């Protein structure tokens, strides 16, 4: 099954400049913790970089960043912000093997159709080195659907998301639930997942603070 949604990509193509240009704070605290858990100069793949807001903070943390987005239009906007090339990469085209110390996927895998998400997580798992760190965030819910802009969201529950990660071997997986915002400006429940690639645990349980 394809991991892309045409209507969602069409939205980002049409709104790329406005989306990238909006006032948005990078996830500084999470990025700092992410970078601190990696070796100096760690090679990190960023998925769904959008306008490049997090990319700036990741680069400032001293990481060897490979920033990408599935939307050519957003990749161009991010490239302008960063002053360096940003790759166009659809999730279903991730084909690296043990190439990255970390993967940063903030607010992007939430657009992957539910049926396709376990396969995409498997691709990310394969792209990570042993002991590699993987961060992703999702808008929480109980059933997949679309927002008022027509964008698709998988809206997982914590238990559903755990099952999506479960088929792969993760040394640890930490899931935290928080209220945050979004492009529509509305308060939104979010799931923040940090996982470490390893073979010690299979079908790991979700940890809660």
Which role does the model predict for each range below?
Residues 1-50:
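Conserved class I S-adenosyl-L-methionine
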Residues 51-93:
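Class I SAM-dependent methyltransferase SAM/SAH-binding core
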Residues 92-103:
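A short acidic, Gly/Pro-enriched loop at the edge of an enzyme's catalytic core
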Residues 118-130:
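A short glycine-rich, Lys/Arg-flanked "PGG" loop and its adjoining helix->strand segment in the class I
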Residues 131-138:
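Conserved beta-strand signature within the Rossmann-like core of class I S-adenosyl-L-methionine
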Residues 144-160:
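Acceptor-substrate binding/catalytic loop of class I
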Residues 182-209:
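Core SAM-dependent methyltransferase catalytic element
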């Amino acid at each position: 099954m394809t991991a892309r949604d045409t209507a969602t990509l069409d939205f980002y193509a049409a709104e790329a400049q406005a989306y990238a240009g909006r006032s948005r704070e990078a996830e500084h605290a999470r990025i700092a913790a992410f970078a601190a858990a990696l070796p100096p100069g760690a090679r990190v793949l960023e998925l769904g970089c959008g306008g490049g807001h997090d990319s700036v903070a990741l680069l400032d943390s001293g990481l060897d960043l490979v920033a990408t987005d599935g939307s050519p239009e957003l990749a161009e906007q991010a490239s302008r912000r960063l002053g360096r090339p940003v790759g166009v990469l659809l999730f279903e085209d991730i084909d690296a093997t043990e190439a990255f110390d970390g993967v940063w996927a903030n607010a992007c895998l939430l657009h992957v159709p539910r049926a396709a998400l376990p396969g995409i997580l498997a691709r990310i798992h394969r792209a990570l080195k042993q002991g590699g760190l993987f961060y992703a965030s999702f808008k929480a819910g109980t059933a997949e659907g679309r927002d008022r802009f027509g964008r698709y969201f998988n809206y997982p529950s914590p238990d559903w998301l755990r099952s999506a990660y479960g088929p792969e071997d993760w040394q640890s997986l930490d899931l935290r639930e928080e209220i945050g915002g979004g492009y529509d400006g509305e308060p939104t429940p979010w799931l923040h997942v940090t996982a470490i690639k390893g073979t010690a645990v299979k079908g790991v349980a979700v940890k809660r603070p």
